[in-house]
Curated annotation (Swiss-Prot):
Vacuolar metal transporter involved in intracellular metal homeostasis. Can transport iron (Fe), manganese (Mn) and cadmium (Cd). Regulates metal accumulation under Fe starvation. Acts redundantly with NRAMP3 to mobilize vacuolar Fe and provide sufficient Fe during seed germination. In association with NRAMP3, required for optimal growth and photosynthesis under Mn deficiency. Exports Mn from vacuoles in leaf mesophyll cells, making Mn available for functional photosystem II in chloroplasts. Its main location: membrane. GO terms for cellular component: plant-type vacuole; plastid; vacuolar membrane; vacuole. InterPro entries: NRAMP_fam. It is found in: Vacuole membrane. It holds the Pfam family Nramp. Disruption phenotype: No visible phenotype under normal growth condition, but slightly enhanced resistance of root growth in presence of Cd and increased accumulation of Mn and Zn under Fe starvation. It comes from Arabidopsis thaliana (Mouse-ear cress). It comes from the Eukaryota. Belongs to the NRAMP (TC 2.A.55) family. It is a multi-pass membrane protein. Expressed in vascular tissues. This is Metal transporter Nramp4. One of its GO terms (biological process) is defense response to bacterium.
Length: 512
């Protein structure tokens, strides 16, 4: 995509993240009238708290993926089995997640397009269809965890009167109610997420205060790296839950909810500055909430015989057995926090599904129709899971392991295209990431992929003793590695024949 192509307006037939009338107006807030700071590179708009407030929103929606029920389960298992020793890893994993999400935001702001749209434009049909299918599979896997988490919380809060499958139906329906708020403006929907995040923070902070974890051990766990063979699985789980493939697609679309002219360099720089501040603050809040959960279970169950048996489904009951009822039973406080996590992540999952499907397939349809399609794709497998696993907490935990592996498999198909695109000057123009940032980003991506690869190998190692399972696993592994290498090769420096090929594409775009 040439610089001219990047700046051309979207055609009427093309899918777009937000219509112009839906975007939050930023221009003219706390700045001189008719100011154009591109004419004076040494000058830039002054920092404005009002502008920061107007840019605040997308980062907090993005941060929900760091607080979904899958992350909560990883937190509680890390605390129960590893104690305080993996808090340092949680901190660095969150920092890695921040880097990936800032690159995603950079892509969306600088190009005016989100990741799924750019993948549709940059990859051949067969490759983008594979990427779309992988993104949808990752989204369905995440959605199962999120909806089941909400259903578990509803079951607890109803004292078991509402079965798991009914909780799934309730979660699916109220998801549409929340998304309906977007018709009244994106800020209304963002306010709902702020309330849900605040609910999580208050619930888990109350539990933190009730159980009184050791502040000294918390500080040591955050500052002193420590890893043993016994806690490797929990360490891999922490890293694996932080990078969610659908969230990479989502953030590049969310940042387009603010009116930013990509043709004006100072506007893009300003937006990136405010989005960086907002995203950092949002993930700092998510880190604190995750620490609350980890330390509560470290204080309560580390070193006990039941530590290995605790999962999302039975965690509340274990807490209740240990700390009793009281005026505010800890079981219900836990359930309220999990419900807020499940509801918020389910909404963002549906939201991400709209952008992924619309971007890859260029579907021009009303948002509620896309939401219905994406919700239907996820609700059927989730309902099956709820009916099959309703009576077994241990089976739910085993299913969660499978779903974590599923997310691990999909990570390269979001992260590699992102890094290739933000490193490409033809797409990003002057906002292409610099060589040092490229190097750091690729090292981080390789580390995350390697860690998740370890999880996959460990999980599928049992297939080595079964010939029937071994053959398809080997075939899948070969195809998987070949496609990942293909994606990486697309990000290498353009060869002369590729430049010639891209130049032939430009007249075709002019005909559009």
């Amino acid at each position: 995509m040439s610089e001219t192509d990047r700046e051309r307006p979207l055609l009427a037939s093309e899918e777009r993240a937000y219509e112009e009338t839906e975007k939050v107006l930023i221009v003219g807030i706390d700045e001189e009238e008719d100011a154009d700071y591109d004419d004076d590179p040494g000058n830039s708009p002054k920092f404005s708290w009002k502008k920061l407030w107007l840019f605040t929103g997308p980062g907090f929606l993005m941060s929900i993926a760091f607080l979904d029920p899958g992350n909560l389960e990883s937190d509680l298992q890390a605390g129960a089995i590893a104690g305080y020793s993996l808090i340092w890893l949680l901190m660095w994993a969150t920092a890695i997640g921040l880097l990936i999400q800032l690159l995603s935001a950079r892509l969306g702001v600088a190009t005016g397009r989100h990741l799924a749209e750019l993948c549709r434009e940059e990859y051949p049909t067969w490759a983008r269809m594979v990427l779309w299918i992988m993104a949808e599979i990752a989204l369905i896997g995440a959605d199962i965890q999120e909806v089941i988490g909400s259903a578990i919380a509803i079951k607890i809060l109803s004292n078991g009167l509402v079965p798991l499958w009914a909780g799934v139906v309730i979660t699916a329906l109220d998801c549409f109610i929340f998304l309906f708020l977007e018709n009244y403006g994106i800020r209304k929907l963002e306010a709902v997420f702020a309330i849900l995040i605040a609910t999580m923070a208050l619930a888990f902070a109350w539990m933190f205060g009730q159980t009184k974890p050791s502040g000294t051990e918390l500080l040591v766990g955050a500052l002193v790296p420590k890893l043993s063979s016994r806690t490797i699985k929990q360490a891999v789980g922490i890293v694996g839950c932080i990078i969610m493939p659908h969230n990479v697609f989502l953030h590049s679309a969310l940042v387009q909810s603010r009116e930013v002219d990509p043709k004006k360099r100072f506007r893009v720089k300003e937006a990136l500055k405010y989005y960086s501040i907002e995203s950092t603050g949002a993930l700092a809040v998510s880190f604190i909430i995750n620490v609350f959960v980890t330390t509560v279970f470290a204080k309560s169950f580390y070193g006990t015989e039941i530590a290995d048996t605790i999962g999302l489904a039975n965690a509340g009951q274990y807490l209740q057995d240990k700390y009793g009822g009281g005026f505010f039973p800890i079981l219900y406080i836990w359930a309220i926090g999990v419900l807020a996590a499940g509801q918020s992540s389910t909404i963002t999952g549906t939201y991400a599904g709209q952008f992924i499907m619309g971007g890859f397939l260029n579907l021009k349809m009303k948002k509620w129709v896309r939401a219905l399609i994406t919700r239907s794709c996820a609700i059927i497998p989730t309902m099956i899971v709820a009916l099959v696993f309703d009576s077994s907490d241990s089976m739910l935990d085993e299913l969660n392991e499978w779903l974590n592996v599923l997310q691990s498999v999909q990570i390269p198909f979001a992260v590699i295209p992102l890094l290739c695109l933000v490193s490409n000057e033809q797409i990003m123009g002057s906002f292409k990431i610099q060589p040092l940032v490229q190097t750091i980003s690729w090292i981080v991506a390789a580390l995350v992929i390697a860690i998740n690869g370890y999880l996959m190998v460990d999980f599928f190692s049992g297939a080595a003793t079964n010939l029937i399972l071994l053959v398809p696993v080997i075939i899948f592994a070969i195809a998987y590695v070949v496609f990942v290498l293909y994606l990486i090769s697309r990000g290498l420096t353009y060869t002369p024949w590729q430049l010639v090929a891209s130049s032939h594409k430009e007249p075709q775009r002019d005909d559009e």
